[in-house]
């Protein structure tokens, strides 16, 4: 089967860097050197790593959202991992840093998003980088500018672990920037949610087995969306944006708890259970 590529992208998966204060101080120091040298350029005000480009429509947001969270769910943290920034140089019209350490994360995001039927990654090889500034055509044509940029030094590492302020985001190309961040469609913390552990590694494993009609009988009217697809979406992951909803239904529905624990439907053994109060 031919692979579709996002060669005309309209969104990207963003890894924002503004939360990492030590990196930002050094990053801004590099920008100051460039401006102090008189290089005509537009400074990047939202430092980030573009992990993959996307060609998606608003109706795909839900699928990409879930794919991102499944990547987070499947991460094997160990002692965490390091991201290394080095080698300022010119890439196209931009001054960039090489970025090492996120290759596996890029591959996982592409694979999980494609598994949802959405278009990710480009036909050209992905190169991990962090943009510092964009050069004007005039600045790019000045040999002294090019020589200065190629002579610059930068070497910085950040460690990513479950307590780091690392996030994965869906961002539309051309999105507004404010206070060092892009306006996002979806933004998820990559760390482990210590406040709640799902009864299964993947709640999605029981989707299609647990019966919504039975679950609805144990809940208050309106607790679950009337549309079945919307209801499954609400229950299909336990991350930041609906952790309260998941815990609420898990507490209230005996059937849902048993289905989660057994990874199977237990309708034949269903009985009315008392509703637990918050």
Swiss-Prot record:
Q: Mind telling me which InterPro entries this protein's record contains?
A: Coronavirus_NS2A, NS2A-like
Is this entry keyworded Zinc-finger?
no
Q: What family does this belong to? A: Belongs to the coronaviruses ns2a protein family.
Transmembrane feature ranges: none
**Protein name per Swiss-Prot or TrEMBL:** Non-structural protein 2a
Q: What is its main location?
A: host cell
Tagged with keyword Nucleus:
no
Q: What is the lineage of its organism?
A: Viruses, Riboviria, Orthornavirae, Pisuviricota, Pisoniviricetes
Q: Its GO CC terms? A: host cell cytoplasm
**Compartment annotation:** Host cytoplasm
């Amino acid at each position: 089967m031919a692979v579709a590529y996002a060669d005309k992208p309209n969104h990207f998966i963003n890894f924002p860097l503004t939360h990492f204060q030590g990196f930002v101080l050094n990053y801004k120091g590099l920008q100051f050197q460039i401006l102090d040298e008189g290089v005509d350029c537009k400074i990047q005000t939202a430092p980030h790593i573009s992990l993959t480009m996307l060609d998606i429509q608003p109706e795909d947001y839900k699928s990409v959202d879930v794919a991102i969270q499944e990547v987070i769910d499947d991460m094997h943290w160990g002692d965490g991992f390091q991201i290394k920034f080095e080698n300022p140089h010119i890439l196209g019209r931009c001054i960039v840093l090489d970025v090492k350490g996120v290759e596996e994360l890029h591959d996982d995001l592409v694979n999980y998003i494609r598994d949802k039927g959405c278009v990710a990654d480009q036909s050209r090889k992905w190169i991990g980088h962090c943009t510092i500034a964009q050069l004007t055509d005039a600045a790019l044509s000045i040999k002294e500018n090019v020589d200065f940029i190629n002579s610059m030094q930068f070497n910085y590492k950040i460690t990513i672990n479950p307590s780091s302020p690392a996030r994965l985001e869906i961002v539309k190309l051309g999105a507004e920037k404010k206070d060092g961040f892009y306006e996002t469609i979806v933004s998820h913390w990559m760390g482990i949610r210590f406040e709640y552990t799902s009864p299964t590694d993947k709640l999605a494993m029981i989707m299609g087995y647990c019966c919504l009609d039975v679950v609805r009988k144990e809940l208050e009217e309106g607790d679950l969306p009337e549309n079945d697809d919307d209801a499954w979406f609400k229950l299909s992951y336990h991350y930041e944006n609906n952790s309260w909803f998941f815990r609420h239904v898990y507490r209230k529905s005996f059937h849902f708890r048993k289905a989660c624990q057994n990874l199977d439907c237990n309708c034949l053994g269903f009985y009315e259970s008392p509703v637990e109060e918050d």
